[in-house]
């Protein structure tokens, strides 16, 4: 008897972007950034992306990336650019 494996769809539904409740990271990104514009949407989206996937992909590296994008957003807001 052979083991049947479901091939991961790494383009449309990569496992490191799937959350335990059926949502995918893209669902959260779209909901949160829907009312944001330009660089603010990009920065917030990247913060969320790296936080959502850190435990399944690159661990501390992803948390540092999230921190980098968050720091950039904070800097822009402090300068009145957002």
Give short role names for the model-derived ranges.
Residues 1-82:
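Intrinsically disordered, low-complexity regulatory regions
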């Amino acid at each position: 008897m052979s083991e049947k494996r479901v091939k991961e769809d790494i383009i449309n539904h990569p496992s490191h972007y799937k959350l335990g409740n059926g949502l995918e990271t893209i669902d959260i990104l779209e909901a949160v950034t829907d009312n944001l514009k330009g660089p603010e949407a990009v920065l917030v989206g990247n913060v969320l992306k790296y936080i959502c996937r850190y435990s399944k992909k690159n661990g501390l590296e992803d948390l540092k990336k999230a921190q980098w994008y968050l720091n950039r957003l904070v800097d822009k807001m402090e300068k009145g650019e957002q």
